[in-house]
């Protein structure tokens, strides 16, 4: 359940930091709280900006309300998953997994320098980046544990997808090209169907979690 409160909660703290050589001030305010029965997590304006900074090609100067609201919805969903994930203490990323995930994140940008500059613009420290990466890995491991390990794709589903989706798609995109036989693309189709099922199961889980949780928007963005 989502409740919206008028912005009676004004300012938490004013952060001063340098961004691309120019000093900036960011007023950090409380944006929302999320409680899925484990604890109450606070989402701040800085959390939104950190989320945007980690999304390639997203503008950081004067972000639009749409961008901020997308970031807030994503963070709310992440908090819901994370609160569930932390009920399972064995879901802890290794140092290698953390390093690999961080390296993969950097590769989404044109260069390590661009990545570092974006972090500096929003005042994200190396420690905060590590915390965010660790949280993302915990969520990924939890979703794998909850959904991926139990997804079963039948041979009929694979055959149906090959006939009804894969073959027409190839014929439309590449007229005259011979469609690869089912056995050649079976693994690809199985992976596609598995990811679709996991996405559907995750969406259903989040719909239920949002209904059960206490989500309060303190300051609309």
What are these regions (language model features)?
Residues 1-6:
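Positively charged n-region of N-terminal signal peptides that target proteins for export
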Residues 19-23:
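Sec/Tat signal peptide C-region and signal peptidase I cleavage site
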């Amino acid at each position: 359940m989502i409740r919206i409160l008028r912005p009676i909660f004004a300012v938490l703290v004013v952060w001063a930091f340098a961004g691309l050589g120019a000093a900036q001030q960011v007023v950090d305010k409380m944006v929302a709280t999320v409680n899925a029965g484990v604890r109450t997590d606070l989402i701040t304006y800085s959390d939104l900006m950190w989320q945007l900074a980690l999304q390639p090609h997203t503008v950081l100067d004067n972000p639009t309300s749409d961008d901020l609201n997308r970031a807030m919805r994503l963070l709310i969903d992440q908090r819901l998953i994370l609160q569930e994930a932390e009920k399972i203490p064995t879901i802890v990323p290794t140092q290698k997994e953390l390093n690999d995930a961080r390296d993969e994140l950097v590769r989404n940008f044109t260069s390590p320098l661009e990545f570092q500059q974006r972090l500096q613009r929003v005042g994200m420290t190396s420690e905060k980046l590590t915390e965010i990466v660790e949280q993302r890995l915990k969520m990924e491991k939890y979703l794998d544990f909850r959904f991926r390990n139990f997804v079963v794709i039948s041979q009929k589903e694979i055959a149906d997808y090959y006939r009804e989706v894969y073959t027409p798609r190839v014929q439309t995109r590449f007229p005259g090209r011979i469609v690869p036989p089912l056995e050649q693309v079976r693994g690809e189709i199985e992976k596609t169907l598995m990811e679709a099922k996991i996405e559907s199961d995750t969406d259903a889980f989040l719909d239920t979690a949002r209904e059960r949780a206490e989500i309060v928007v303190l300051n609309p963005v």
